[in-house]
């Protein structure tokens, strides 16, 4: 990566602005998954160990109007972070103004401050999400000319708290998490050790058209599962019962199949049910066709075996999207089967592209078996598509 990193700048005595991704799930004010906070710790610890004063920015959820602020404060995150760091985290509870400025100016070397949810600035004109120039300049003015972007999860967005600050500081650099995310995902796609197998699941072809096109050029095989299977099936005239289908993407699916040169591998059977919820019958299909009155909700046992065979000997695997409705035990065998097929390959570099796939690996107890699990679903998708990420492009060149 030809961008400056946090190790390339002198941090001692400096007020260092840091964009982290603390967009964690909260239930009744309690954090239910702290992975993103843990992922940011190496960069934060490095800054304070070097004598920097870390000023952290993050969003939490979506905030469009005043009422949306309820339950979206970063206060619980500040408490959790303090416990993880073993030191106080200053939390003024505001995004701008005298209270924030005084707290920042009172910081000493090695201390940490967390600014309130950056999206509170979206209430009046979407200043954060629309990269308001004045807001970016203001936040940049709170530091000493150094900005560290460690939020891969928002790197595909041009917001005031990443691109806006970057444009108004002397040096905008990558944190360790951002550096690792780019290294793992970009290197896997651009310079993979082969055979390189990509696995794409999820419900919609429309979400993955660009990714499939890019990976058909880069990968040796592209395995397709999840709900989008049935759009590919219908495009070939295969009966799909009541399964999910994107009627307006049938021509796209047909086109992808035609130009894939056999690289695109589809499931050969499904686990079908007579309803999505409240079903009374679940069974494996004989072949590709889904029965009338039924819908496919997972890949079937023959498909698991086929995908296992396709993954044999793989040296690089990128997986994005579950094979079925994995949250339901009746439809998680496909996702488990594919995960197990990936991790049993010797010497494989295995990467999960965030989102539902990451949740599946964590919930189904396979997370520690993968080389890398991305913290950013949308950002990793755009990297897999070969797109330039605004948050990364805005950083200072080496």
From Swiss-Prot:
Q: Which GO terms describe its biological process?
A: gluconeogenesis; glycolytic process
Quaternary structure (record): Monomer.
Q: Where does ATP bind?
A: 208, 296, 327, 354-357
Quote the protein name from its UniProt record.
Phosphoglycerate kinase
Q: At which positions is substrate bound?
A: 21-23, 36, 59-62, 119, 157
Its pathway?
Carbohydrate degradation; glycolysis; pyruvate from D-glyceraldehyde 3-phosphate: step 2/5
Q: Name one GO molecular function term.
A: phosphoglycerate kinase activity
């Amino acid at each position: 990566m030809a961008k400056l990193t946090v190790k390339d700048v002198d941090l001692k005595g400096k007020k260092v602005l840091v964009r982290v991704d603390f967009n964690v799930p909260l239930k009744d004010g309690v954090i239910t998954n702290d992975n993103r906070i843990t992922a940011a710790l190496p960069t934060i610890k490095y800054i304070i160990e070097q004598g920097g004063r870390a000023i952290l920015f993050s969003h939490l959820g979506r905030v469009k109007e005043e009422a949306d602020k309820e339950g979206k404060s970063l206060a619980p995150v500040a408490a959790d972070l303090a416990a993880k760091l073993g030191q106080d985290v200053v939390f003024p509870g505001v995004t701008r103004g005298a209270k924030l400025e005084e707290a920042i100016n009172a910081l000493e070397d090695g201390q940490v401050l967390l600014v309130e949810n950056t999206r509170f600035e979206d209430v009046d004109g979407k200043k954060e999400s629309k990269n308001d120039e004045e807001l970016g300049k203001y936040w940049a003015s709170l530091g000493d000319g150094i900005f560290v972007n460690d939020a891969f999860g928002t790197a595909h967005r041009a917001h005031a708290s990443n691109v806006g600050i970057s444009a108004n500081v002397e040096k905008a650099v990558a944190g360790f998490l951002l550096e690792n995310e780019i290294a793992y995902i970009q290197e896997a796609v651009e310079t993979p050790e082969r055979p390189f197998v990509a696995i794409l699941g999820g419900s919609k072809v429309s979400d993955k058209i660009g990714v499939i096109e890019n990976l058909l050029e880069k990968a040796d095989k592209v395995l397709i599962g999840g709900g989008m299977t049935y759009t590919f099936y219908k495009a070939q005239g295969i009966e799909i019962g009541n399964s999910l289908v994107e009627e307006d993407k049938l021509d796209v699916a047909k086109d992808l199949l035609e130009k894939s040169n056999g690289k695109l591998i589809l499931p050969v059977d499904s686990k079908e049910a007579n309803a999505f919820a409240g079903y009374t019958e679940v069974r494996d299909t004989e072949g590709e066709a889904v029965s009338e009155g039924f819908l496919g909700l997972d890949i079937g046992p023959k498909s698991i075996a086929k995908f296992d065979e396709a993954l044999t000997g793989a040296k690089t695997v990128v997986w994005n999207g579950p094979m079925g409705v994995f949250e339901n035990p009746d439809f998680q065998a496909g996702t488990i089967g594919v995960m197990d097929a990936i991790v049993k390959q010797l010497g494989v570099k295995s990467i999960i592209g965030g989102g539902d796939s990451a949740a599946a690996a964590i919930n189904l107890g396979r997370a520690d078996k993968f080389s890398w699990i991305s913290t950013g679903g949308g950002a990793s998708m755009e990297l897999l598509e070969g797109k330039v990420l605004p948050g990364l492009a805005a950083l200072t060149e080496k």
